[in-house]
Amino acid sequence: MAYRLLRALFRGLFRVTIDGVTDQFKHEKLIITPNHVSFLDGALLALFLPIKPVFAVYTSITDTWYMRWLKPYVDFVALDPTNPMAIKHLVRMVEQGRPVVIFPEGRITVTGSLMKIYDGAAFVAAKSGAAVVPIRLDGPEFTHFGRLQGVLKTRWFPKISIHVLPATTIPMPQAPRSRERRVLAGEHLHTIMMAARMATVPRETLFEALLSAQTRYGRFKPCIEDVSFKEDSYQTLLKKTLGVSRILQRFTVPGEHVGMLLPNATITAAAIFGASLRGRIPALLNYTSGAKGLQSAIIAASLKTIVTSRQFLEKGKLTHLPEQVNEVNWVYLEDLKDTVTLTDKLWILFHLCFPRRAMLPQQADDSALILFTSGSEGNPKGVVHSHASLLANVEQIRTIADFTPRDRFMSSLPLFHAFGLTVGLFTPLMTGSRVFLYPSPLHYRVVPELVYDRNCTVLFGTSTFLGNYARFAHPYDFARVRYVVAGAEKLAESTKQIWQDKFGIRILEGYGVTECAPVVAINVPMAAKVNTVGRILPGMEARLINVPGIAQGGRLQLRGPNIMRGYLRVENPGVLEQPSAENAQGELDANWYDTGDIVTLDEQGFCAIRGRVKRFAKLAGEMVSLESVEQLAISLSPEGQHAAAAKTDSAKGEALVLFTTDSEITRERLIKAARENGVPELAVPRDIRVVKALPLLGSGKPDFVTLGKMAQDPEMSV
């Protein structure tokens, strides 16, 4: 009777729903592993699961007064994590057919994300051979019974959902020692819990996700700031978004690709969300690519309109672009301010109260945004992402990293770069964190000062940018920073060392590609390994395809929710080319993406990048990584610029060419460095050319197309 009354009370107050595979609790041996978000979790499971399980509860909690009061109504067993016999007792209970609930995190979350996973529950599952049923609780964290007051917008009676995921098993790992087997089993359970989180993420559009974040963290919570030093709340950002959307619809149509040539600023964020909510697809243009790069993007994406700012063009010395690129309609934000009418203002006011009614009908799998590749190996390609792929990558990041609304992001990487967009804008907004948008990562003195002044805790950048920030920063500038993540290029040892020595901060290296929105793998404090880029993100499948001549590793191919919808190419304007990749049998598999990168995956799942397939040279039948040649030069001259290319050779098929700005680099010095680093002498170039500067793309990456032409033609210069 008491159970029925309490169940009715909870269902009435919290509108509790239970969904998923609810008929799988009949397994002979069963372990239930929920996430732990509040003190209500145990009561919810006891009341709403269709079975009466035993709860494994730590001894520190079983001795409290309320647990003694609950003992007559709920079966629980005291679990002492320091006593090995406690685990054996749980194994016996499971083997006897008692379903057991174990909270793998061992404590209520204080971040809103998954915390450390204890390996005890996993070892019990592996030892007993029990079915593991992960459960995802959503909603209790918003109550006053959670530990996220001041982090989330708490309320008395939020809606609570209990998601039951499909049962799985944890086979006993193969390892010589019991301790190692426990650790490996724990990592398997961690993977299961992360997959459960990803499986229950709602399918939304970008604008819907922004509204959900506003509801979750509070409409008046500050969320975004730029160089105007005016901090906007979710409500203010929504107001600007509605305003831009109202104006954009005057000269664009639903489904149109709309070019945006804008800096890192709040108005750019509003323009992206504003275009999206009215069914327009923003194409974020690289303002460093020059007129030729812009024209390629315009052709590939079939752009008719480019939205920009006169002030931005003047400050960036880009006023020549509208004159040189005259095949599109240029629209200036400054000119639009005076066109806002009373009707527009009333429309904005109404939809501030009912924002979802401003949206045109859209699906999560519809095209949401177009980014462009750097063009380092040919013409830039338009990369079309859906709402679902962008938001999936955000959730993948949030699943493995413990970002919270207390964090402050410094975002200086351009928003036209996938790294800057997803990690520097969408992730903080969807997490409730504050983000400071700065227009240039090249201001090496200003960025560290702003990190210090705005109390930033999260900083992302390339190895080059982070190395220069360290050179100019005061040792105290990064005192509050707890996450520094490097991506987009290989992390230099010198950069890693100066951050450790000067600031006491370990840089976490990650790996991504524009086609994957972009993060593919990343080291985090909970799972990091030196000389790797971390583990592949949850929800992604990875496979390695053998490449003839390369003994270690293979060509990385990926499939997952964050993969792009497809390419837009200059050669086939406006036509979406869906992703596919050749499998080991040479057959095309749809929805797989071939990164073109040679990587290794170790037994723990950590990924190490060896180089790009296109950046290998074949010398007398042996494959040599051009990046390994560059690393030799960097070891001799860390301050210089170095790039390797290949040229045709009648004797060996191909020969190496090293371009460097350091005239003191010689073949003899390179041979000595190769011997010291265990690099074969075959990887030491005979052709060393000193240049004043390397040819660079607008993104700052070397222009390998031009370098390849220079390698073939000794007379050609930058």
Curated annotation (Swiss-Prot):
It catalyses: a 2-acyl-sn-glycero-3-phosphoethanolamine + a fatty acyl-[ACP] = a 1,2-diacyl-sn-glycero-3-phosphoethanolamine + holo-[ACP]; a long-chain fatty acid + holo-[ACP] + ATP = a long-chain fatty acyl-[ACP] + AMP + diphosphate. Its EC number is 2.3.1.40, 6.2.1.20. InterPro entries: Aas, AMP-bd_C, AMP-bd_C_sf, AMP-binding_CS, AMP-dep_synth/lig_dom, ANL_N_sf, Plipid/glycerol_acylTrfase. Residues 15-138 are annotated as: Acyltransferase. Keywords: Acyltransferase, ATP-binding, Cell inner membrane, Cell membrane, Ligase, Membrane, Multifunctional enzyme, Nucleotide-binding, Transferase, Transmembrane, Transmembrane helix. It is a multi-pass membrane protein. SMART domains: PlsC. Residues 233-646 are annotated as: AMP-binding. NCBIfam families: PRK08043.1. The chain crosses the membrane at residues 258-277, 409-433. Plays a role in lysophospholipid acylation. Transfers fatty acids to the 1-position via an enzyme-bound acyl-ACP intermediate in the presence of ATP and magnesium. Its physiological function is to regenerate phosphatidylethanolamine from 2-acyl-glycero-3-phosphoethanolamine (2-acyl-GPE) formed by transacylation reactions or degradation by phospholipase A1. Pfam families: Acyltransferase (PF01553), AMP-binding (PF00501), AMP-binding_C (PF13193). The gene is aas. It is found in: Cell inner membrane. The active site is at 36. One of its GO terms (molecular function) is ATP binding. PROSITE patterns: AMP_BINDING (PS00455). This is Bifunctional protein Aas. GO terms for biological process: fatty acid metabolic process; phospholipid biosynthetic process. In the N-terminal section; belongs to the 2-acyl-GPE acetyltransferase family. In the C-terminal section; belongs to the ATP-dependent AMP-binding enzyme family. The keyword Plastid does not apply. One of its GO terms (cellular component) is plasma membrane.
